[in-house]
Amino acid sequence: MGSISRYLLKKAADGLKDEQRLKIEMSDSKSVPECFHFNRERRMPIAEINGEDGFFMFPSQQSLENFENTKKYSNELSPDAIGIPLFQIINCTLPFGKRGHSNTVVGNVPYYKIFKFILRTADEPPPYTVAKIVCSNNGLILYKVPLYDIYKNVSQANVTYSFVGTTSTEPNLLAMAHREGHRDLDTKVNNLNLRWHVTYSPVVTNDHYKLILLADYEVNRLDEDVIRAAKNKMSIDQKDQKVQRFVAAHYTREFETSLFRWVAQEGHLILGEYSTDQGSFGLNNIPPLTEELGCQSLLIHYIEYMKRQRKKIAKEARRQNKRNVANTTNMNMNLM
């Protein structure tokens, strides 16, 4: 077998392992909370659109591809709502757009905002008074509405992100928290203790987060003090038990596409859901849990993006300093 054939076989095998590693378990076991009794897997791409601020999340790969193959927002709207993004997240602290260098919050200004796209018929009233019309045709209207303001609070031990609903119908129950200097993000959804866990690698930066279900005795950074104290008092024997981690979702950047395209895939949320409409790939019939985890993964994506930007800026500064030192040295030598 030639080297090219071996290489192709290895790539195919690696791809199969990646697919298996990112699979979502379909289970109706009593040991798994009922909200995680899934009957299908959904893949929601996160994309950067040329000329637009922030990042967009699409309800399915099919929806993104439909959007990419048509002109932005000018395609014919259809009742299946395929080809329309579900969410957009923007950074409120960057004065020069998404690629600005600042990340300083002023007063009570939110760090991030999440918008939701909603499709209605022309006969239906707007979903909210703050709804902005994006486009309309075929008796349908596409609205863009503010969904969450995300505030960042830095305490002595934790960094907490609070999702504040911008309409009266959105509950203010979403929050994520991590230890200062660490990447794992704790959250609570449906009163369950969950953690977006990323495995540390000293060699390369790992961008694969798993949403895992915590055991009853494991401390969540969003726990109240009395609950945290009770968990810490649990027996060591119980804590030493090996826990079978149930994974409800994955966030990954493994399938990103070229940045030189006008729509560049930069990440994916892969999650399980229970759906009564197995053929829905657009905005229709998306479960609330899917939307909540979608908003959380968008925040993770932007946090990781800002870290890469800061590293890039620091690297460029070091290069510029080296060039300045070299130029100064050359000038001094020429003067001698």
From Swiss-Prot:
Keywords: Cytoplasm. This is Protein DIA1. Involved in regulation of invasive growth. It is found in: Cytoplasm. The keyword Lipoprotein does not apply. Present with 736 molecules/cell in log phase SD medium. One of its GO terms (cellular component) is cytoplasm.
